Each structure stands twice: as structure tokens, then as C-alpha cells.
């Protein structure tokens, strides 16, 4: 079921991303699949900004995929998209294909 990304669960998402990045081998890109996010509040946008900045400091790009229109509008109004170190992909598969050459060179 679709959910909101908001103050109560945004920190969980942040912790989960960094647990996964730090637990694995070298990571160059993180893709956050947003298909189930139907609403996002300002604190969640701020959390995404923090995730984007921290990943950038680690040399990792943050990408988004399958972002719904209203969520994309909120991210655009908050100027998050201009700060995003990666790309916004229409579909998760598109992100995979776009990033595959980078992964193959690693």
C-alpha cells in the first residue's frame, strides 16, 4: 500500500540507507524507489537533503525513481531536485539501465 514519507518515518529511511551503504562493498549510487510514496512533508524533504549531502560526502550519488507527480511537485518547490547529486528516473528499470555501465566498471 502507498504511504507517506513524513517526520515519523523519515529517520528510519535515513538510518536504513546508511546501514546498507556502510555494510556492503564500495557503493557509487543509491536509488530510492519512490513508487509507494504518495505524500511527503517538509521534515521528510529535509531528511532527503541530509541523505543527499551525506552520501555526496561519501562519494555516492542519490537517485530517485518512480516519483509520483504530487511528490515531485513538492520536491521541486523545495528546490531539492536542483541539489540532487543523481538523477530522477521514470522507472526503477530505467535507473538500473542508466547506472549499469558505472556498476560494470567498478
Question: What do the PLM-derived regions correspond to, one by one?
Answer:
Residues 1-106:
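Structured cytosolic domains appended to multi-pass membrane proteins
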Amino acid at each position: 500500500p502507498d504511504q507517506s514519507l513524513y517526520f515519523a518515518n523519515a529517520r528510519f529511511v535515513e538510518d536504513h540507507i546508511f546501514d546498507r551503504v556502510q555494510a556492503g562493498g564500495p557503493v557509487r549510487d543509491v536509488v530510492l524507489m519512490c513508487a509507494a510514496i504518495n505524500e511527503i512533508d517538509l521534515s521528510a524533504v529535509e531528511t532527503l537533503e541530509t541523505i543527499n549531502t551525506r552520501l555526496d560526502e561519501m562519494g555516492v550519488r542519490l537517485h530517485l525513481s518512480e516519483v509520483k507527480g504530487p511528490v515531485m511537485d513538492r520536491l521541486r518547490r523545495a528546490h531539492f531536485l536542483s541539489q540532487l547529486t543523481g538523477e530522477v528516473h521514470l522507472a526503477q528499470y530505467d535507473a538500473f539501465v542508466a547506472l549499469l555501465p558505472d556498476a560494470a566498471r567498478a
